[in-house]
Amino acid sequence: MENQPKLNSSKEVIAFLAERFPHCFSAEGEARPLKIGIFQDLVDRVAGEMNLSKTQLRSALRLYTSSWRYLYGVKPGTTRVDLDGNPCGELDEQHVEHARKQLEEAKARVQAQRAEQQAKKREAAAAAGEKEDAPRRERKPRPTTPRRKEGAERKPRAQKPVEKAPKTVKAPREEQHTPVSDISALTVGQALKVKAGQNAMDATVLEITKDGVRVQLNSGMSLIVRAEHLVF
């Protein structure tokens, strides 16, 4: 037992479970819904194997059941399976709806992250373009003026025309936003904005959760947002 290799990550544990219980777990493709209480079955069946601890098993199960491919497999009429692939009852409507919401929130988070990354790339490209478009101006050599001979009359200096100062164009005022410092002070139905890079999208508070605030965008999409991305 002491010479068994140790699995260091949840992905390695999932790969081991897919090999150990191929009729229950899968390493790729759509996953089958698991039996309720399967954690205890795993503890009983793989206790001591690969130096696995309960904490590792619990973390691997959490990662497996929150993956997109597992959530895609939670559909009405689908049957749960045990470690040997035996049917253990159909999914109820509550579990199907919960999985659907989790999948929508995960997609919304990815979309928001991509939008923020694209905004940063556009800002960096714009800053680089401004530097390239403004090369240093070369100084022209000053023309040499012949020295005035002694006794020669001085010519009156031509007066320079008075140049009018160019009118300063006022830059448009940037919209100022106040960050949300305490999400507990928010109320359901309250209007606020969600920051995505340099932009702020209008949203409405749907629910205040322990992970953040669930909001609905004007597009109809709902997602959970952390306090640092919320402003008034």
Curated annotation (Swiss-Prot):
Main localisation: cytoplasm
Pfam family, one: ProQ
A molecular-function term among this protein's GO annotations: RNA strand-exchange activity
Domain of life: Bacteria
Positions of region (Disordered): 105-182
Bias kind Basic and acidic residues: ranges: 117-136, 147-177
UniProt biased composition (Basic residues): 137-146
Aminoacyl-tRNA synthetase as UniProt keyword: no
Subcellular locations according to the entry: Cytoplasm
Keywords: Chaperone, Cytoplasm, RNA-binding
InterPro entries recorded: ProQ, ProQ/FinO, ProQ/FinO_sf, ProQ_C
GO BP terms, alphabetized: post-transcriptional regulation of gene expression
Gene Ontology CC terms: cytosol
PANTHER family, A to Z: RNA CHAPERONE PROQ
Similarity-based family: Belongs to the ProQ family.
Function: RNA chaperone with significant RNA binding, RNA strand exchange and RNA duplexing activities. May regulate ProP activity through an RNA-based, post-transcriptional mechanism.
UniProt protein name: RNA chaperone ProQ
Organism: Shigella boydii serotype 18 (strain CDC 3083-94 / BS512)
Classification of source organism: Bacteria, Pseudomonadati, Pseudomonadota, Gammaproteobacteria, Enterobacterales
Gene that produces this protein: proQ
